[in-house]
């Protein structure tokens, strides 16, 4: 369970150097890789990939294949296809993680609005400050929803003249109803990003409400807060197509201390070296899927993605040897 909150870390100072590196052509970039020892049998093919991926997007995927010195020399026998294969693998991992995040995020939205609306018998419960701990944060929520509504009214109709295109539920509410000003809760939650959704949940004033919402997706309130704080970062990386497989996220999911939350079963199933990698994030996503989508094939698809990867890839992710044998995973793989 997460410990007490810490004060925000002070911003690091800016560097003092002047950036004066000139832009390089595709030919020059391919030449640079070749000079560093990367085997490139087809230069035109390499240029084509660099043109459509970008050298500096692909560059981080070269680092695991380098010898480690400041000159960025590649290990003997490393080919352009080795780097490209790692890039494609990471893309597959991002797509798989986004698939799970979508289900988890949708379930969280539904849990929040269902509990609060029915418990208090008010579809506009979120307008009342009595449900929230911090007035400024609540004001921010209302401002977000109000701005979204105003932007929707200022724009053109979703449907226009096309009978096959239906208006969104939010547009229907805004053009059909004049009061209350803001939409009901089940429309409100759809206007929020996952970060705003998490902030709204954390700002609920009653512990009983936070507990009930978390319980609806198989978690305790402190664990939900920790995991969703991590998901905000992970989703941002995925949405911007960033490197995920060996990225240091800076924030990681709390390890549940209760057996009521689905988690790894083996005592050594999550070594210390794995706790600050992407692996516990994958475990946490499957944990929630156990509650909200128990028939999901996500674990099987993850296994298929990881099954044939070299040890370097699994180590970078924090995935321990024999990971799929743990009962947490194996029940989904039989």
Language-model-derived ranges and their functions:
Residues 2-334:
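Long, contiguous internal "core" modules enriched in hydrophobic/ aromatic residues
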